[in-house]
Amino acid sequence: RPAALQNRYAGEAGGLSGAPLFAPATDILARVAGHAKQRLAVIGVGGVASGWQAYAKILVGADLVQLYTGLALHGPQLPATILAQLARLMQADGLTNLAAAKGQIPDAEKAIQHALRLSQISVTPKATA
């Protein structure tokens, strides 16, 4: 379990899913994608509940992104929400498709920070005059 996990159940045995896994799972994904070198499909998992989180997984090399806990917590509209957010994030990066984003930032921490920063400027609806 991540050392930073502050939940009262942090020491319990059993499964762990969702937000606590996002950063460590993205780091492992980046390493796997680096070793795979396009020879196999890599699936980004762990803590994805927003477009920026999915984008970070793609930036480190994910071919696919799995939704699990996020889908359970946010409901069946989550995939459509994430797709709309991904479109805005790609536009902010000057990209027209996800294939162009795949593997562009192989360092997990940098990819996470980039995706988060973009989400703060591009996903928030802009006020109209």
Language-model segments: residues:
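Glycine/Thr-rich beta-alpha phosphate-binding loop at enzyme active sites
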Residues: 1-38, 74
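A glycine-rich, aromatic-flanked flexible loop/lid motif
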Residues: 1-9, 52-61
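Glycine- and other small-residue-rich loops at beta-strand/loop junctions that grip anionic moieties
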Residues: 17-21, 43-47, 68-71
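Extended, intrinsically disordered, low-complexity segments
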Residues: 22, 84-129
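A general structural detector for well-ordered alpha-helical segments in enzyme core domains, enriched
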Residues: 25-28, 53, 78, 82-86
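Alpha-helical structural signal in soluble globular domains
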Residues: 31, 35, 60, 81, ...
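Glycine-rich beta-to-alpha transition loops that act as phosphate-gripper elements at the mouths
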Residues: 38-52
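Glycine-rich phosphate-binding active-site loops on the catalytic face of alpha/beta enzymes
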Residues: 48, 54-81
